[in-house]
Amino acid sequence: VNEADNAYVTAFRERLGLPGIIDIHTHFMPEQVMRKVWEYFDSAGPHIGDREWPITYRDEEQARLKTLRGFGVQAFTSLVYPHKPDMAAWLNEWAADFAARTPDCLYTATFYPEHGADSYVEAAIEAGARIFKVHV
C-alpha cells in the first residue's frame, strides 16, 4: 500500500465524516484479461489524443484488495467487460466466483450486444448480480 495515498484517502474520508467508501469503479478480471487491459492502456496514447493513460495500482489481485481495504473501502465492484462476442458469459461466471470468495465485492456482471445475451443476463440477475458494466 502506498502510504502517502493511504494517508490522503483516510484524511479525506475522515474529514467528510464517512465511516467508509464504496468504490464503484474498480476492475478485477481473470489475470490474463487484466494483463491485456493493462497492455491496451499502455498503448492507448494515439487513440486518446497522444496522452498517457497510466494505471496506478498495477498489482496482483491480493495486493489491490489490500490497497482498497487500506483506504477504508467497504464495498467495490469487479467491473468485468467483454470487448468481443462470446466473452461475457464466462466473464460473468468468473465475476460470480470472485464475488463469492471476496465478500466486499459487489457481484458485477456484463453483457455484449450479441445473440443470446438475454439468457446469460437473466442468469446473472437470478444469481444475484447487483451491477452491470457495459460498453456500448
PLM-predicted stretches and their roles:
Residues V1-V136:
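Helix-coil boundary/capping segments in enzymes
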